[in-house]
Amino acid sequence: MTNSPITEPSPRQESVLRYPVLGSRRPSNYFWATAVSIGGLGFFLAGLSSYLHRNLLPIGNPIDLVFIPQGIAIGFYGVAALLLATYLWLAIAWDVGGGFNEFNKETGFVRIFRWGFPGKNRQIEVSCPISDVQAVKIVIKEGLNPKRSLYLKIKGRGEVPLTRVGAPLPLAELETQGATIASFLGVPVEGL
């Protein structure tokens, strides 16, 4: 899933521009949560098998492992992996970091919304009048750890990020999105 607009300005609906932001429900997070779950369960069952002297795994023979130190170490790694997998699955279920950027000329406000972890600040929302938006800033850093981000420069608030955390957006999509937002709001683009 990309940050392509859900609704582009059209003759009927040229007053609202809305972009979804992909949070923790990225395909890579599903892959890692599944891999860590399977590996953690395997390690935990191998450690438990060495303690109980009963084979709990469909493949391999962990009964031959000596419980101390091998079985206990494998069991510990299995528990640690299962805890990490639980964290990943909960972050996916809660869609941490997901949300949207909405630019609404009808109400005269920009609304940036993200989901956080459960608790007091589960819903993270930044809202400001369109008149406070000074520019759309594009940051591009290439190299070993590339960074391609869009920021909204807001009077009195500094730079507010518009793009998701994780894999950088393709350059063409980043430039198109930045230009579309700047044109829609009537502000300049910085950083190109």
From Swiss-Prot:
Q: What is its main location?
A: membrane
Keyword terms? Membrane, Photosynthesis, Thylakoid, Transmembrane, Transmembrane helix
Instruction: State a GO cellular component annotated for this protein.
Output: plasma membrane-derived thylakoid membrane
Q: Can you cite a GO biological process for this protein?
A: photosynthesis
Membrane-crossing segments per the record: 30-52, 72-94
Membrane topology, as annotated, equals: Multi-pass membrane protein
Disulfide feature: none
Q: Which InterPro entries match?
A: PSI_Ycf4_assembly
Any Pfam family? Ycf4
Per UniProt, subcellular location reads as: Cellular thylakoid membrane
Function according to Swiss-Prot or TrEMBL: Seems to be required for the assembly of the photosystem I complex.
User: Per the similarity annotation, which family is this?
Assistant: Belongs to the Ycf4 family.
- NCBIfam families cross-referenced by the UniProt entry: PRK02542.1
Know the name of this protein?
A: Photosystem I assembly protein Ycf4
Source species, please?
Thermosynechococcus vestitus (strain NIES-2133 / IAM M-273 / BP-1)
Taxonomic classification, please?
Bacteria, Bacillati, Cyanobacteriota, Cyanophyceae, Acaryochloridales
